[in-house]
Swiss-Prot record:
Organism of provenance: Sulfolobus sp. (strain RC3)
Swiss-Prot/TrEMBL cofactor(s): Zn(2+)
Origin superkingdom: Archaea
Uppermost EC category: oxidoreductase
EC numbers: 1.1.1.1
Gene expressing this chain: adh
Cofactor note: Binds 2 Zn(2+) ions per subunit.
Keywords in alphabetical order: Metal-binding, Methylation, NAD, Oxidoreductase, Zinc
One annotated Gene Ontology cellular component of this protein: cytoplasm
Protein name, entry field: NAD-dependent alcohol dehydrogenase
Stated family: Belongs to the zinc-containing alcohol dehydrogenase family.
Binding residues for Zn(2+) 1: C38, H68, C154
Amino acid sequence: MRAVRLVEIGKPLVLKDIDIPKPKGAQVLIKVEAAGVCHSDVHMRQGRFGNLRIVEDLGVKLPVTLGHEIAGKIEEMGDEVVGYSKGDLVAVNPWQGEGNCYYCRIGEEHLCDSPRWLGINFDGAYAEYVLNPHYKYMYKLRRLNAVEASPLTCSGITTYRAVRKASLDPTKTLVVVGAGGGLGTMAVQIAKAVGGATIIGVDVREEAVETAKRAGADYVINASVQDPLAEIRRITEGKGVDAVIDLNNSEKTLSVYPKALAKQGKYIMVGLFGADLHFHAPLITLSEIQFVGSLVGNQSDFLGIMRLAEAGKVKPMITKTMKLEEANEAIDNLENFKAVGRQVLIP
């Protein structure tokens, strides 16, 4: 089968012809119909998430097939698989655990001590077929097609968890930093659907700002031409916001947007751009603000976002579909901030 693989850090991905894996036990072989392109794929190609090196620090073994936003049809199953049939259209939760560690036992499989992350340390979906390690991490699609469903397995699950951690309700105001991207447009929609909060979308390009507005943001700020803090103070009448979801966590965003928080506000840190956090500690105490990390999502988050999308409450904003051979171009678009919404590869 054709597969696009990371062979060497910092180099373009390489299209290879490799063997189709054979499922056994609880494994499922899926014929890939769509694979979303995520900014984590930029970090993988670069070989690091901030200062964390994927090989030396995270234990990734090369070569590896990228692609963790997965939807497709079941091709073959191991003898332990129940509840599914060949030909079923499924989405796959790529953030899997081995099942035995403390975090797996309490339902936080994405924090597993020995994780099985498809497209990271297990071969992913930039290929004609992908081997899913366990059938319990699948969702049988009834209304969504594969292209619509694939981004939900990362951008959807990640922002669903972040919105939950923000503790929103209709009295609250939320800032989404990076609101015009694949994660940002999902965060805006989920926050509206689940929390009913007032949403301020922030981005740095006019096209991205307009995309955030189409996603449902009540207010939008182009931080490249407007003073975001002044605009946030104006919108909130000086109070500040109840939560910020930072999908970048860059030096720039972390130096600006914590200052937008109201008392008892929450700063939800999602992005992996690798900046350090510098904040005057007494202000955390005096204003009772919280800095909260949020990493992808667990199986409950996966089921939650899939059901929300199948009910028509949210929908990924797919802006471009591309061929498998165009994977490097898609990642270039993200790396150079030329992408808005979500790009999806179709093998």
